[in-house]
Amino acid sequence: MSNVRNVFSQLTDPSLKAVIQDEAYRVLKRELAQTRHTNPFAQSPEAADALEALGINSHPYAITSHTHAAAKAIESDLYEVVSHYLPKENPVSFLFMKPAKLRFFHRGPTHGDHFLNAHVEPKDVPRYPQETIINRLADIPTQIAFMGDTLHFLSPSFLTALFAHSPRLQTLYATLVLPPEPSTSRSLYPQIYTLTYSEDGFMYIPGGHAGASYFHKYDQLEWLTVGHLTAPGCPTVTAQRLETKGANHLFIFQRGNYITPERRTFATNDQYVTVPHIFLPENYNCRTPISKTTMMQMFFYIKSGKEAQREGHLGQVQQLISTKELQHYQPSEITLLVNYFEFTATLDSHTCFEDVPPKLAPKTTPAPPLGISRILQFFRGRPSFVKLIKALDWQPITLEFPVRDVRTTVRGPPGFKNPFTQPQPVNPEDADISSRFQDFSRATNSTPKPTVEAVLEASAESPDHHTQLKVLCSALSEGQLEAIHALGHSRCGGPLLPELTAKSTPVEQCPDLPPCPTKSQASPASSNPSGPDAQPTAQNPETLPWVAWLPKLNALGFEALEVQHDPSTGEMIMPITDTQELPRATLPAHWQGHNLERILSTLRSLNRFPTPWSPDRTRARAFTSDVKNSRTGKALHRESQTWKETQTMLTENTQTELAISVIHGAGGSGKSQALQTLLRQDHSLPIEVVLPTNELRLDWLKKLPHNPPEQFRTFERAFVSSHSPVVIFDDYGKLPQGYLEAFALTHANLELVILTGDPRQSTHHESNEEALISKLPPATTIYSAFSRYYINATLRNSKFLANKLGVYSANSCPLNVTYGFQPLPGLHLLVPSLMKKAAFTDAGHKVSSYAGCQGITAPKVQILLDNDTTMCTKEVLYTALSRAVDSIHFVNTNAQSSAFWEKLEATPYLKTFLSLVREDKITEFQAPADAPKPVTPPVTHFPVEEPATTLDDFKEELRDKFDREIFTSDRGHTNCVQTDDPTTQLFSHQQAKDEALLWEMIRARLKISTPEANIEEFRAKKDLGDILWVNYHRAMGLPKEQPDFSEDLWNRCAEEVQNTYLKKTMAQLKGGERRQSPDFHEHQILIFLKSQWVKKMEKLGAKEIKPGQTIASFQQHAVMLYGTMARYMRRFRDALSPNNIMINCEKTPQDLSRWVLNYWDFSKPSYANDFTAFDQSQDGAMLQFEILKAKYFNLPEWVIEGYLDIKLSPKIFLGTLSIMRLTGEGPTFDANTECNIAYTHTRFDIPEGTAQIYAGDDCAIAQVCPEKPSFALLKNRIALQAKPAYTPQERGQWAEFCGYLITPKGLIKDPLKLHASLELAKAQKKAGVRDAITNVVANYSLDAKLAYSLGDDLQDLLSPHQAHLHQVTVRDLVKFGGSPFLNSD
């Protein structure tokens, strides 16, 4: 290795070093990819070192956490080892294994493997899919089987019975998890697992995490030493260990009597020893195994010191034993160990024997008799040296055991107790599911089919007879299977468990290409077109040549049920052409992960599965050479010379094979639609998009506005900056020749290339004739061989235009072709040369060249015909002609010259559009005359009305003050009716100082409960919350995939909440000082009575005063935290909500008016609604709905738990409140609004697209919708009580929303409400309130302006009474100085 290192150190060329590093990185990348597959978790340094000693690599940049990551890595690694033993062609039976783990064995659905599982423990119910459950292992259908981490819990007789009753089974591979060191009282791999002991067994705790631990009995350790298993009359089974890593072992059990090693060792690199028993009694000797290294260090220490001291020995032991290992020792053991060293330190290290070899003994020294020395030792005792040698006779812990034979008894086939044979306790939350299960079971009693229990009992294991392997699923209805599955899931964790899967999942074969459509397959009617002008004809789908492709065409948006013909040739146009079968690419193992598998699934659904591709180094070298010598490109040649030389050397020396998927199709065929949908749904996918032009990049950004901009790069920037394993090259034909190959060879991280383009359109043209790439064939020619089929259909162009180009079209709009002699202003102009492009651009036109217009789509384009047109290729002309949707304007400066007709003859497409005859004169295009300008009607005004009678009807029904006030015996009357003025008495004045009203508000609005009762209610109504959430999810059009949590958006929302709070005045901030204190408990709430004038029309002049509204003052930190939560979800809601649903949040009346004009339907009666006691009615069902909504947006768990805690335990001075909404919470408005939406859509069957508007407890719908039949079963459990209002939507009767009327001209303020409010201000002014008018005139004038600005249109909107109120109000506002606001823009 040193020689190789020396050679590398002598290399000085940076380009050569870059190539070597690139090659090393390619090897490293493959190894890291494999590591990510088997060990994707973040490991501690100690655990990573321990795994590496076992031959398992750890990913250095992994961030995925796991409670027992190291143990999981060993488990996955043993699966990887097993995969090399399993056959690649034949199926294998997997026992006690989840199908999801099949990826660790490098196997998939195509292998047809069998999964045989049983519900033994409760956690097995959600773990194993229902279709894999059996209740006896009687006949394994394959020769080879695998059992994962289960055999150590079973008896040896299970194994012999398994082989005895499965004659086809020859080999069983099994992994066991049994630590071999229980006798040593400590874990050999504390970084991976720990052990605890009891009298009858021990606990195995992977990663020290108690949640993953399980219990072993000591007799289960016998599995580590089993060699042969025999039973009377049964074949012998031979066991042999294949691999051991820590506590995980891989065994093979083979039918037959084979030789197996007589001993097995489980020793590690670290040697452990125990000290001999030198003290009496024996239990006062140290028994703890200690590292031999530590013992040797301690021995040298005690023998190298001058004098033995107990304190010194104890301190040295403390230094040698690390802090982490101290937990494995008892103080008594340490004390005994120190005594041992203290004793051995006193013993003499010098030999006491005088015997020496004869050659070394002096001749004059007589040899003492050996027998005499032994006799003297017997009487005098052993010398100190002999005692020392005996004390140093440490006993090693070898972990080596003899292999033994095991004899078992004869038993029936392995089986498992049926969990349905005895009743099980059901939680209250399971009531609905249990009810469904019982209903399904009862439903089958009236049919010949047996019930669930009967079927399971019939298939239960019997000791003397065995009939079947699996439960007969045909005896169970789909509903029963679903009920069983749901019942099991609900008992083991709820909605996070996997869903019920189908009985069988069809396996899609790749390349999955339907038969190539041929013209000979057409019916006689479709194969004989009537001529060039034949119109498309409807066809029976079964007779279409492309019937096998209809699902794919439908997915792209084509019905494809009619036959279309090329008008120039009369031939049928096929929507799918150029089909070919291609081999499938073999992708790295880590592609079985979730994100990368989604990409493959998308390509598989398109029949575009990747195929192998080896980049052409000749084309790559041509491109990098041109870049190096500045012969091409605008930006790459500005890179450093060293970088350019490195790229050139990489293309010369690198060889690689990648996966490529080529998507070819006509313009507007939806080539990129599925890819854009994939990127839109998941922004985190490791995909980059490379575009040939910045215009195309901006187009992608416009279609995917929420994706990060750096995901889309132009081709030169991508060549320098790209690092993704998957790259999409859109419109790749416009990339320089050789670019794709150079990109693939210089980017070692690239694994999958996706190309989208159209070989029939123009390709990149290199204007520099000196460039090497100018001599290369177009990329579309090369990569057409990698395209499985061509989509010869378009959604863009008119059928009459597309058919002339030989393309199938789904757009039936008529084609409009016009001619002229000069360009029309405002239309996109296409010209054949760059010179003409520059000239017309300078003249003020929007211009593109024929070749440069690729990617542009416009309803109408104009095409310039000149002498350069004849030099354009058919691909360039096709590109230009296919830009228009349904209208083309040809521009020719000399239409009658012979050159013009030569142009038509020289090009293959133009003649199909220009139906001209030489002798006929071309009809010149004449623009239609401008429409006459509308005459502005004369300005009129409403007639002057007498204001004195506007509120007389309300005043006449007024009762006396004390007849209206609320009376209580302990606090007397409330004080809401004030002054003697009848106008003022119409409005209830609620004041915070009114103690009688405060207590009446508490009695009516608040309900005292306990935390336990709140929890019980929350649990009891969870099912209702689930229903509300499902309806809300559907109504708001939320995607199925949950959006990832955005830390950046959360921080911005928190800043907005904080800034809003800091905008308060100093007095307001000081007023909230108490709840800002850290001593103010987060559950504590201060309750106040809201001071207000009640101006609701239904309470105007009310006969009885109603209780006031509450104001709740929460801890300020909690308000800001959950205000941030509400604002965060609001941002997502605003981005995802459908256009027909408007939420009046951060919107102006003008915004609402624009929305009404676009979406509201006034042709039907409308529905509006308010609620009775809306806040108090939001009980446990609404709380569950809020929790599910927060979880959907992936809010941090601590935020959700904190919000739930506050809602369940809110405390006021009277005690704990029940679950309800309180004004003053952070998310009050958003939560009210969303609960309103959820309730409305749960109650009503609202057609899709119906206009709806919501704000808190107010809502309005553009039509009256029928109530869902299911709501009759729910309404008695939902506390909300609606107050619906129906209006016919005609003059004077419009839907009301938040004090506004929704009219065909937009929103206007309710004239009665506005007039009444102004009358109150006038009465207050009269009563002596100096600023009563001044404070409101601006706001009231702006409210009135909504109607005032409509002018005479109000005559069509307002009833006579409303018009009267409007005129009086405007007249008063003008008197009070409101004219500037009424006439403002």
UniProtKB/Swiss-Prot annotation:
Q: Where is the composition biased (Polar residues)?
A: 518-540
**Entry annotated with the keyword Disulfide bond:** no
Q: Which residues bind ATP?
A: G665, A666, G667, G668, S669, G670, K671, S672
- Ranges of residues in domain (+)RNA virus helicase ATP-binding: 635-791
Q: Which residues form the Alphavirus-like MT domain?
A: 59-224
Give one Pfam family, short name only: Viral_helicase1
For this entry, the protein name equals RNA replication protein
